[in-house]
Every structure is written in structure tokens, then in C-alpha cells.
Amino acid sequence: MEFKPYPDIVWQPTKELLANSQIQKFINAAGVADYDELLTKADQDPEWFWNTAIKFLDIKFYQPYDKVLDQSKGIEWVEWCLGGKTNLVLNCLDKHRDTAIWSKPFIHHETEAGKKSSLSYAELDVKVCQLAEGLRSLGLSKGDAIGLYMPMIPEVAVAFLAIIKIGAVVIPLFSGFGPDPIIVRLNDGKAK
């Protein structure tokens, strides 16, 4: 990647940092000369770009897609990965099972009082699977909308991933919304 200095930018990476960056790794994997060529080729052939990005990011599918995108209804109505089936839990947790990453921290947390904790991929997986089974035992399943109203603690990641694991839809809620907007969101989303 060619280093092009811009005088009005406060911080610029070193050439070494650029050479080892994820964008440079992507440029190399895409088989293009530099960032400008990547942009040009992506603009000319979005299907090539997104297929390349999905492979580079190692996004897994239970069922491979037939076509990466369909823009026939217009750019604002693009359909992605037609025929494919995937799940966020597959890509955040499951694909790392039986790898060195499995025992590494997925979440680091520090309370306002300064207490620190972490959850490894494996520990998070156990909690996600337990909660997913609990949700299923309550009769919740694929396609159901489930409101998630929790503070930013590690358990919110457990709940979010458990909801997604069963194929349900998360309706994220925030205490700053107030009661009436929360009721509207739950009703509009047909939350169970």
C-alpha cells in the first residue's frame, strides 16, 4: 500500500504498521495492487468484492449461498447471500471450537467499582447454550422476537447470543428510552 501523507490528519500510521494492517492483508488476498485499485474493482464488481470479503473474514455458512447479492430491486433493497444460511453464533463462537482461541477471553469486564472479570469463548458458550435451552423450554423459537432490556454487563452478551442461537430476533432496549418507547418497540416487534 502506498503511503500518501495528508497534512490535515492528526495521526498517520507508520509504513510498517500499514504493511501489517488488516486492510493490507485484505488487499493482498484480493489480488489487487493497492487500496485505490481495491476501491475501483469493488465499485465495478460488487459481487467480486463481497465474495472476497466473506472469504477473507472467514464467515461460515450452514448452507452456502448461491449468489452473494441481488441488486435487481435497487441498491436500497439489496438481498444478501441468497440461498445461504448462517448464524451470528456460528461465526462468533462455534467456528472457534477446537481451536487455540477457544480458551482465550471473549469478554473482559470491569465494574464501576474496579472489579475485573473475563469469560473465555468456552465459558461463554456454556452459558449461551444453557440460556438457549432455557428459552426453548419457555416455548421460544426461530422467528420469535424477544425484548432484551439489560445493563451493559457480560450477561447481556450471553442473552443476545442465546436469543440468536435459537434463531429468534433480538429487540434491544435501553433504559434511556423510557417506559412508553419501550412499550412501543415491544408491541411493534411483536415481542413474546
Question: Where are the regions a protein language model picked out?
Answer:
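A short N-terminal helical cap/helix-turn-helix that marks the beginning
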Residues: 41-43, 51-65, 82-107
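Structured binding elements
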Residues: 167
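Conserved AMP-binding/adenylate-forming core of the ANL superfamily
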Residues: 38-41, 103, 107-161, 178-183
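A short N-terminal interaction module
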Residues: 15-61
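AMP-dependent adenylate-forming
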Residues: 23-24, 28-30, 92-120
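Charged, compositionally biased N-terminal leader segments and the immediate start
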Residues: 1-22
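Active-site charged/polar residues at nucleotide-handling catalytic sites that mediate phosphoryl
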Residues: 189-190
